[in-house]
Amino acid sequence: EFIEQDAVVTISATQEDAPWGLARISSQEPGGTTYTYDDSAGTGTCAYIIDTGIYTNHTDFGGRAKFLKNFAGDGQDTDGNGHGTHVAGTVGGTTYGVAKKTSLFAVKVLDANGQGSNSGVIAGMDFVTKDASSQNCPKGVVVNMSLGGPSSSAVNRAAAEITSAGLFLAVAAGNEATDASSSSPASEESACTVGATDKTDTLAEYSNFGSVVDLLAPGTDIKSTWNDGRTKIISGTSMASPHVAGLGAYFLGLGQKVQGLCDYMVEKGLKDVIQSVPSDTANVLINNGEGSA
C-alpha cells in the first residue's frame, strides 16, 4: 500500500454566452463566449465599491449588495448615476460578474453627475480602511476605485492606507490617453492600476498608460448592471478595473493572500497579447487560469 498526498478537488463552472470580458479572462485566445471559473467564485470575500453608489435591489446582485455610507453630500443613499452599479456588476454580479459570490458594499463618494470632491473621496477611502475589519469577510477584502482626478498626494496617501490595512485595491488608470502618473489614485504604487483593452485585443484608444499601469483588462463595450434594474453597455478604464477587483476576490476565495496579489495576477496573466501598448507599459492581460482555449 502507499499513501499519497490528498488533493483538493474543486468544481469548475461554466457560463455560456457570457459577456466578452468574462470570456476573455478565462481564455487563452480572444473571441470566446464561455466564462470558465472555479465554483467558489469569491465566496467568503467582500468587495467595496467606492463610486456613485449601487442600486442594491438589482436582481443580478441576489441580495449580496449593501449600501454602507454616503460621502457625496447629496443625501441620496442610492446610485443616481448608474456607474457604480455597472462597476459592482462586473465585480460580483451573478450574470455579469467575475466573482459571483462576493459580498458587495457601496461607499458613495460621487453624485448623480459622477462628480465629487477630493475630501469626500478621501473620507470614503478612510471609512473603508476602518470598516473592513468589522465585516464578515474571512477570505479577504478587495476595493475598487473606478474614478480619478489630478495627481494628489492626499488621495494617494489614503490609497496607500487601504493597502497597508491588508486590503486589495484596484484602480482605473484613467481615460485621457495619457500617462497615468499624472492622476490619482492611479499613480499610487501600492494600488493595482488597470488599463483597458477591447474585443480585438488592442489597448483602448482612450486608456491611460505608463509605468504605473500594472495590468490590462477588458474595458470597451462592457455589458453590466444599471441603476434602472436593467443593463447597459459602456466603455472605460472604469470597466477594466472591476474585472481586476473581481479577479482579486476570486483568487482570495481560492486561498490566495492579499499580500502580493497584484504581482500574482501579473504572473498568471497573458503576456504581450495586446496590440498598441507603449513600451513603458506592462503588456499583461488578466487571466483566471481556468480556460483552455
Curated annotation (Swiss-Prot):
Residues 19-293 form the Peptidase S8 domain. Residues 1-12 form a propeptide. Pfam families: Peptidase_S8. Disulfide bonds join C46-C137, C192-C262. One of its GO terms (molecular function) is serine-type endopeptidase activity. The keyword Protease applies. Its EC number is 3.4.21.-. It is an enzyme of class 3 (hydrolase). GO terms for biological process: proteolysis. The active site is at D51, H83, S238. Belongs to the peptidase S8 family. This is Proteinase T. It comes from Parengyodontium album. The gene is PROT.
